[in-house]
């Protein structure tokens, strides 16, 4: 019988605890994919956890459905914690600690400004991209046709160039809200544009040619052999100038925070390599642990993934696999190949997570109770699951993603075709 999340918080915790007891016939804890198809435990497909205000739509099918509402916005574009969230206000960090990485910065004034989220292409034609190695956080998610796309969040570090910049998706109604960030992107489909226009991000936290924000905030760099849509670039510094003009270039006041620790937490199991097969041979994210640097090195489909600005391979202190409900909507993104429908990735409520750090993986769950809360991470018993101080890459995956289990320290995650 499929395991399903229940409707209230206590029952949800009970369900997660039950699922944590289910294991592979190998060493990988089944909560690696509390919802996923595990080869030894059978298919476990929970429904998404409801928020306090509505029930999420069912797991995605290939039949488009009307889009579900995003979590209720705050009253204004300025994030404000709800009374319920007030009890969760974290102990303030020292003013020189980056809340998105847990690292101290040399100049604390770099944190007295707004984070900037930028949409970056992952089409093979644009690789290597520019600027991803400088981001605090990078989210990778399905766009359509199996191709993935990135939303990179920059805070203290401002690379000189980021791109190529591409169009936004429904997930970009969520990520800028989580991190109180200005969002820079090239535009969007008509349906996504309307969702953005009616969100609490608009207009102050939105920067796109779609809404009349062109040069000097975005600029073209024509490159031989590259299509026009792959030539748009920007950088966080110039977008912050726009934020300054709008009066929003301020240090965020986050109502909840992630937990960081240099000490390796308990409960991990060894793994020195894993991959996520979004689109095998094209968008396969591969991560190998380097014990000398104590970081995960990223490759794409067998080729080291480098930053065009430095020529260096992209690395991460943490790689976080966030499993969430993926729902096709009635928003059409394009018409090629018979057409593709926009995917709503429901990163609200809570769901399963696997955190890779220090050559180990740690299963647990993620939580986001309010719209302007960032994702936070916990063991099955509700104890905070700390990240390693440093940058993080977040791989967003459907609930019914399959896993190979651990074989010789390696794991393969295979999401359904989308």
Label each region the model flagged.
Residues 20-39:
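Sec-dependent bacterial lipoprotein signal peptides
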Residues 2-6:
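Compositionally biased, intrinsically disordered low-complexity segments enriched in Pro/Arg/Gln/His
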Residues 80, 87-135, 144-418:
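A surface/extracellular/periplasmic glyco- and lipid-processing/surface-interacting theme
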Residues 41-96, 107-108:
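Ser/Thr-rich, Proline-interspersed low-complexity disordered segments
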Residues 15, 32-33, 52:
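Generic short N-terminal amphipathic or hydrophobic helices
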């Amino acid at each position: 019988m499929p395991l399903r999340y229940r409707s209230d918080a206590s029952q949800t915790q009970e369900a997660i605890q039950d699922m944590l007891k289910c294991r592979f016939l190998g060493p990988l804890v089944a909560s690696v994919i509390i919802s996923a198809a595990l080869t030894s435990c059978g298919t476990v497909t929970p429904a998404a956890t409801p928020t306090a205000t509505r029930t999420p739509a069912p797991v995605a099918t290939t039949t488009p459905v009307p889009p579900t509402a995003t979590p209720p916005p705050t009253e204004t574009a300025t994030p404000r914690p709800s009374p319920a969230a007030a009890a969760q206000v974290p102990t303030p960090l020292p003013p020189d600690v980056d809340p998105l990485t847990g690292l101290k910065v040399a100049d604390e004034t770099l944190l007295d400004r707004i984070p900037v989220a930028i949409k970056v292409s992952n089409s093979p034609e644009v690789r290597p991209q520019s600027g991803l190695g400088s981001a605090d956080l990078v989210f990778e998610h399905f766009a359509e046709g199996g191709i993935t796309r990135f939303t990179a969040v920059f805070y203290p570090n401002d690379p000189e160039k980021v791109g190529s910049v591409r169009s936004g998706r429904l997930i970009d109604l969520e990520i800028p809200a989580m991190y109180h960030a200005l969002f820079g992107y090239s535009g969007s489909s008509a349906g996504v544009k309307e969702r953005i226009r009616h969100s609490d991000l608009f207009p102050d936290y939105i920067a796109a040619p779609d809404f009349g924000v062109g040069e000097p905030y975005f600029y073209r760099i024509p490159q031989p052999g590259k299509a026009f849509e792959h030539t748009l670039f920007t950088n966080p510094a110039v977008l912050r100038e726009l934020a300054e003009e709008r009066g929003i270039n301020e240090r965020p006041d986050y109502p909840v925070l992630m937990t960081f620790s240099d000490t390796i937490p308990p409960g991990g199991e060894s793994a020195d390599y894993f991959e996520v097969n979004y689109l095998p041979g094209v968008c396969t994210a591969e991560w190998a642990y380097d014990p000398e640097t104590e970081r995960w090195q990223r490759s794409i489909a067998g080729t080291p993934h480098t930053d065009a600005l430095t020529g260096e391979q992209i690395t991460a202190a943490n790689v976080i696999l966030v499993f969430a409900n993926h729902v096709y909507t009635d928003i059409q993104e394009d018409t090629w190949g018979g057409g593709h429908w926009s995917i709503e990735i429901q990163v609200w409520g809570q769901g399963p997570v696997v955190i890779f750090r220090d050559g180990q993986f740690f299963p647990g769950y993620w939580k986001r109770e309010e719209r302007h809360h960032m994702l936070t991470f916990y063991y099955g018993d509700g104890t905070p699951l700390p990240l390693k101080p440093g940058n993080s890459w977040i791989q967003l995956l459907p609930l019914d993603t399959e896993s190979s289990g651990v074989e010789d320290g390696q794991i393969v995650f295979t999401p359904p075709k989308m």
